[in-house]
Structure formats: C-alpha cells, structure tokens
Amino acid sequence: MNNLPVVRSPWRIAILVIGFTFLYAPMLMLVIYSFNSSKLVTVWAGWSTRWYSELFHDDAMMSAVGLSLTIAALAATMACVLGTIAALVMVRFGRFRGSNGFAFMITAPLVMPDVITGLALLLLFVALAHAIGWPADRGMLTIWLAHVTFCTAYVAVVISSRMRELDRSIEEAAMDLGATPLKVFFIITLPMIMPAVISGWLLAFTLSLDDLVIASFVSGPGATTLPMLVFSSVRMGVNPEINALASIILGVVGIVGFIAWYLMARAEKQRVRDIQRARRG
C-alpha cells in the first residue's frame, strides 16, 4: 500500500506552532522565573537559585510534598491492581447479568464532578465513623481511599482498551497446551498489557498528585497535601518557592515520562517481533 502524500500547509504549521506555544510557553516562563531573585514573582531582578535553597528548608512545603508523593504512589499502585481486575472482568467475562451496571459503576467517577465525589466520600466517612468508629480521624488514609476510588476508573478504561486489542489466539494456545488461566494471565496477558498498566499508573499518579477538591473534603488536621498548601499560599500571594517546586516537578515528570515512553515503545516493538517470529516458526 502506497503511503498517502503529506500535505504541508503554512496555515497548518502556524496553527501547530501556536498550539505548542500556548501549551509550553507558560511552563518555560515558570522555569525561568523560578530563578528570579526577587520576592515579587512578576518582577525580574536577576538570576538566582535562592528559592531552590529556601524550598528545601521549608518544613511545611517538604512535608506536603512527601505526603502527596506517598499518597499518589500508593493510590496509583492500588488503582492499577483494581483497574486491571475490573478491565479483566469487563473484557474477558463477556456478557453476564449485571455487566452493564458493573461497567457503569466502574466508569461513573469519570463523569462525576469532583465536588460531588468529595462530598459523597465525606458523608460516607462520617457515617462510618459514627457507625463502627472507623475511620477515627480523617487524614492520609481517607485521602488515599478517595484517590483510589476515582483513579481506578481511569486505569480500568486505559487497560480495558488495550485488552480489547489483544490477539486472544496466543492465550487460547497456551490454555490448549495445559496452562491454567492464572498462569496464562501472568505469563502472557500481563506482559502484553504492561504498557497500558504503566500508562495507567502514571495517569493515576498524576491525577492523585494534582487533586485539590476531593482531598479538601476528606482531609483532616495535619494532613495537608501539596495542592492544598499551594492553593492556600496563592490566596495570600504567590510564594516564589512554588515556582521552584513546580519546576522540579516538571523536570522529574518529564524525565520519568520520557523513560516510560521509551521502555514501552521498545517493549512493544519486541513483542511484535516475537509474535511475527512465532507465526513464521
């Protein structure tokens, strides 16, 4: 099949440049102003790494960063486990009584406003505390449970879309050779959906790290996440330390994202080569 000719248009290039400018110019300005020596974030006074130094000596900021990263990592991991199970049920179990309701309940958090989700979870935790005495206090645990609730929906959608594209003949061949369903899943299915699992984990991690509304409802005294601290700081005036912290997060996320993309692309190419080699053999 002949490749379609690529039509290059100045208008298309201009629109592309404008789009990327709107996306990445604010990030570039953020990184530049993180090296501003002035306390006023909008007034340039020269290059300095002062705010990076003060950032690491700010106990409240470091505590919020540690709490947010811990919750995000744990929530993303649990969301991947639950999301994989949910995707397996939706894709592999076919039609069963209540399948539509199950799929709706899994994906409902995708279209639910954060305010409604946060309020509903708050009422749930308060009711449980009155009924069984748990949770005794709202804090890291309640935030983690809330983040797992809505992150699982995103992970399930990502993994289920990948599972629908898989060639089931490989799994069926393994079962014909005597492999148990559990062994087939861990040896064949899981490696093939691993790029989607990694993508889902990164997406869930980002969503959890970025959440403000839901965490504000279900958090308690002493459990202040990074978005909550940043939002409260911005209301009283933008702290230059926030620019430094945001620049570090951008750099880390960019590096991790590139590494994940590279590893997934290499794994996908290797998987395609292995399948082609197996079919030829």
Describe these PLM feature segments.
Residues 20, 63-70, 124-152, 196, ...:
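Loop-to-helix entry region at the N-terminal start of transmembrane alpha-helices
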Residues 35, 59-90:
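Transmembrane alpha-helix signature in integral membrane proteins
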Residues 25-28, 32, 81-85, 119, ...:
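Membrane-embedded alpha-helices of multi-pass transport/permease systems
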Residues 2-14, 90, 94-98, 160-175, ...:
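C-terminal transmembrane helix and the adjacent membrane-cytosol boundary/short C-terminal tail
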Residues 1-29, 102:
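N-terminal signal-anchor/first transmembrane alpha helix
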Residues 14-15, 20-27, 155-167, 179-210:
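Transmembrane alpha-helices
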Residues 40-45, 49, 54, 115-148, ...:
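Membrane-interfacial helix termini and adjacent extracytoplasmic/periplasmic loops
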Residues 2-8, 39, 52-61, 209-262, ...:
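Interhelical loop and adjacent transmembrane-helix boundary motif
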